[in-house]
Amino acid sequence: MKTTLASSPPKRPIEWRKAFSAMRRLIKNPDATDEVFTIIEALSGNSLQKGFSRFVTTDLGREILVDRRSLLETLLNREYLATLPQHSLAALYLNFVTKENIRAEGLVAPSEGMRAMKNLDADTLLFANRQRDMHDLWHTLTHYGRDELGEVCLLAFTCAQSPNRGLAFIALVGIFQLSKRYGRGVYGAAYRAYQDLSLIHI
């Protein structure tokens, strides 16, 4: 299979008003995951297309597209994950989601309202879903928890791996809000998360 890219995809608008409205709702209700995706869609611009362009330059990326590998399907197959070696990423991930009582499809429903996802070609959609479904794998690799500070630090780390204006906005607002409660050390923790690949523990 040969993957082709549009030479210059139309530039998607940045919708700050929409993002700020969603952010106000998210601050009032931090569990409103759908607002996270509203902010990401409002501010991402062409981040997804840029990430996909990088993805298809790698051998592994092209292999994933050829094989139509769904990360979500793999993560949902707990029987298979349980057969893999004890200290593998699969085993660590399975232990994490079991302990936290969460499932891999937890972000699917909140992301379904994103208009931009509805018009993607099959390859870009597979990549976009893979980006979404990486979240709990990043938790596993970095050992950041699902508490507020852990999530903010994980967002900062994710921004370093996949630059995205929407994720950065959520992370910065989260850092500011947490610093009012816990002090300026929150800034240092988030900055370390952003810059330090040694946080990956496996």
Please annotate each region the language model reported.
Residues 35-38, 65-69, 105-112, 149-153, ...:
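Short coil/turn segments at secondary-structure boundaries
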Residues 123-189:
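Conserved binding-pocket/active-site segment within a compact domain
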Residues 16-19, 36, 48, 86-90, ...:
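Short runs of predominantly hydrophobic/aromatic residues within well-ordered alpha helices
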Residues 31, 35, 63-64, 101, ...:
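Residue-level signal for secondary-structure boundary elements
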Residues 59-139:
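Long acidic/polar interaction regions in large eukaryotic complex-forming proteins
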